[in-house]
């Protein structure tokens, strides 16, 4: 099963751009990433040509670790395709960059609430929720901007730095 380029939607994808979380054929990769100096900095990895031979009966790629189950995640640091079980076992407490394979949908809620450490998805959600809570707690009616860019609550004992 060939993975199609997300730009031209015609040619076989040869490159995974980790910054864009997209797969591209070689001509589209050159066209997109040579456009300006910022795009040239994107981290990209080549897709393996022989990956089609290591697939399940449904055509999905196999996990590189167990070689038994369907792979759902790509780990950038390990350069490996992982099933859910192997991903949990290996990446429970580290900060490797992992990408969900195209066509797979997941919830933003963790199934395990009592884990000792959280995945990057959970911590990002928590950080976003914390910022929203902080902003709604100190609304514009209750705050005024100081000269240094600080948010100063009308109660002088509360000072928040951006």
Swiss-Prot record:
Residues 137-162 are annotated as: Disordered. One of its GO terms (biological process) is regulation of DNA-templated transcription. Zn(2+) 1 binds at residues 5, 8, 28, 33. Zn(2+) 2 binds at residues 63, 66, 86, 91. The keyword Transcription regulation applies. Coiled coil: none annotated. Keywords: Metal-binding, Nucleus, Repeat, Transcription, Transcription regulation, Zinc, Zinc-finger. It is found in: Nucleus. SMART domains: BBOX. GO terms for cellular component: nucleus. The keyword Zinc-finger applies. One of its GO terms (molecular function) is DNA-binding transcription factor activity. A zinc finger (B box-type) spans 5-47, 63-101. InterPro entries: B-box_zinc_finger (IPR051979), CONSTANS-like_Bbox1 (IPR049808), Znf_B-box (IPR000315). Probable transcription factor that may be involved in seedling photomorphogenesis. This is B-box zinc finger protein 23. The gene is BBX23.
């Amino acid at each position: 099963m060939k993975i199609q380029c997300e730009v031209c939607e015609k040619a076989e994808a040869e490159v995974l751009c980790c910054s864009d979380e997209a797969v591209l054929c070689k001509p589209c990769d050159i066209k997109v990433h040579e456009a300006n100096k910022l795009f040239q900095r994107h981290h990209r990895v080549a897709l393996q040509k022989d990956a089609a031979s290591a697939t399940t009966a449904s055509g999905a790629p196999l996990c590189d670790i167990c070689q038994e189950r369907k792979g759902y995640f790509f780990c950038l640091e390990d350069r490996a395709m992982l099933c859910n079980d192997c991903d949990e076992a290996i990446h429970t407490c580290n900060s490797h960059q992992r990408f969900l394979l195209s066509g797979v949908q997941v919830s933003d809620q963790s199934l395990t609430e009592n884990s000792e450490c959280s995945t990057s998805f959970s911590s990002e959600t928590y950080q976003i929720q914390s910022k929203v809570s902080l902003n709604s707690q100190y609304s514009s009616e209750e705050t005024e901007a100081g000269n240094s860019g600080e948010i100063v609550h009308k109660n002088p004992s509360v000072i928040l730095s951006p």
